[in-house]
Amino acid sequence: MNSFYPSRKLGQNFTVDQSVIAKTCRLIKSLNPTALIEVGPGKGALTKALLKLQLPYHGIELDKRLAEYLLVNEILTEEQLTIGDALKQNLDQYFPDTIPLLCGNIPYSISSPLIANFLASKLQQFVLVCQWEFGQRLVAPVNSPNYSAFGVFCQYHLQIKSVFKIDKVAFKPKPQVDSVLMLLKKKPQVAYEAHFGRFLKQCFHQRRKLLVNNLKQLLPPTLLTNVLQQQDLAATVRAQELTPTQLFRLYLSLKPHLSDGKD
């Protein structure tokens, strides 16, 4: 595969720094997984290190050229590889008798939907390399410029840790921005609420607007004002001023009044 050209459309930037690969594997090993699912094994740099952990493994690769490379070079067997889109896969199908750890170097374009797919599955831990800016949005505090609907959604459901920053020179081709290794763990006793995410999108639709105004297409303003008052929140509050817990409590109070009990 000497003539292989990475796909810009697929956001392919392969990890070439062995120290980054080693640190990633050490983190994964410390989490004591029983099996591994890797999204985007690419040319197998991280894959080879993961296989040395001697755990049940399955990779999901969208690029047929890379899938062929992995098979021809006997990095993976056909049983260890799914050729397809990770966003369209049921992540629970690969190891029905155990709960695997999800990992991978994730293109920016699929970072959010892949986390959503992870949240909807039975999987509990996700170790991912993503763009630095995206990682910052995941951990952004209340009332900060990066505080967003998706960040709130993730913070409510997950324990999120930014493990270490990765310089762009660790990848080939070199991306324009740095990356970060993130660790996502599902919070115990927190049930997945998909409709909460859609509710949050409306809450943050226009950041400068009051929450009442952002939600007026879904609910009568008087109803929303009354619910805010019941929760000791001002009628002039904006979504970015509320914690994930406050926003979820608000969602639960308003849920019966949303269409079909949803948003």
Curated annotation (Swiss-Prot):
Entry's localization field: Cytoplasm
Keyword Transferase: yes
Keyword Cytoplasm set for record: yes
GO MF: 16S rRNA (adenine(1518)-N(6)/adenine(1519)-N(6))-dimethyltransferase activity; RNA binding
Record HAMAP family: 16SrRNA_methyltr_A
Coiled-coil regions listed: none
Similarity comment: Belongs to the class I-like SAM-binding methyltransferase superfamily. rRNA adenine N(6)-methyltransferase family. RsmA subfamily.
Organism: Mycoplasma pneumoniae (strain ATCC 29342 / M129 / Subtype 1) (Mycoplasmoides pneumoniae)
Membrane-crossing residue ranges in chain numbering: none
Residues noted as binding S-adenosyl-L-methionine in the record, renumbered to the chain: N13, T15, G40, E61, D85, N105
Top EC group: transferase
Record function comment: Specifically dimethylates two adjacent adenosines (A1518 and A1519) in the loop of a conserved hairpin near the 3'-end of 16S rRNA in the 30S particle. May play a critical role in biogenesis of 30S subunits.
GO cellular component terms given for this protein: cytosol
SMART domains: rADc
EC id: 2.1.1.182
Protein name: Ribosomal RNA small subunit methyltransferase A
InterPro entries cross-referenced by the UniProt entry: KsgA/Erm, rRNA_Ade_diMease-like_C, rRNA_Ade_Mease_Trfase_CS, rRNA_Ade_methylase_Trfase_N, rRNA_adenine_dimethylase, SAM-dependent_MTases_sf
PANTHER family: DIMETHYLADENOSINE TRANSFERASE (PTHR11727), DIMETHYLADENOSINE TRANSFERASE-RELATED (PTHR11727:SF7)
NCBIfam families (alphabetical): ksgA
Domain of life assignment: Bacteria
Keyword annotations of the record: Cytoplasm, Methyltransferase, RNA-binding, rRNA processing, S-adenosyl-L-methionine, Transferase
Reactions mediated catalytically: adenosine(1518)/adenosine(1519) in 16S rRNA + 4 S-adenosyl-L-methionine = N(6)-dimethyladenosine(1518)/N(6)-dimethyladenosine(1519) in 16S rRNA + 4 S-adenosyl-L-homocysteine + 4 H(+)
